[in-house]
């Protein structure tokens, strides 16, 4: 099992934009502290305020799945329930 990379973007509806921005930093900080997280960034697009570019790297599939489980129990998942997710996930061999 190799490094798992998630790349893509999310689109946040206008109605949720302020709430997402309020909890995003906490979500980033919690994720960056997770065992196995190599890289985690979410940055607002410079041309589209509703688009946030996402780049994640975890040491392996187990670390990536642990992140997914942790995020499901966080404030982030409730605030971000209405966002559109556009991701590509790859795994190095």
Could you say what each language-model-derived stretch is?
Residues 27, 37-40:
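Short, conserved structural micro-motifs that define repeat-unit consensus positions
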Residues 11-17:
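Short, surface-exposed ligand-recognition loops at beta-strand->loop->(often short) alpha-helix junctions
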Residues 29-32, 44:
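Structural motif
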Residues 32-38, 57-90:
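An amphipathic, aromatic/His-enriched active-site/gating alpha helix that lines ligand/cofactor pockets
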């Amino acid at each position: 099992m190799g490094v798992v990379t998630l790349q893509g973007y999310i689109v946040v509806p206008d109605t949720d934009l302020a709430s997402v921005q309020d909890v995003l930093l906490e979500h980033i900080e919690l994720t960056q502290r997770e065992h196995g997280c190599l890289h985690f960034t979410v940055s607002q697009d410079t041309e589209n305020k509703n688009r946030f570019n996402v780049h994640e790297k975890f040491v392996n599939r187990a670390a990536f799945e642990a992140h997914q489980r942790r995020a499901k129990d966080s404030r982030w998942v409730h605030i971000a329930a209405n966002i559109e997710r556009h991701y590509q996930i790859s795994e190095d061999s």
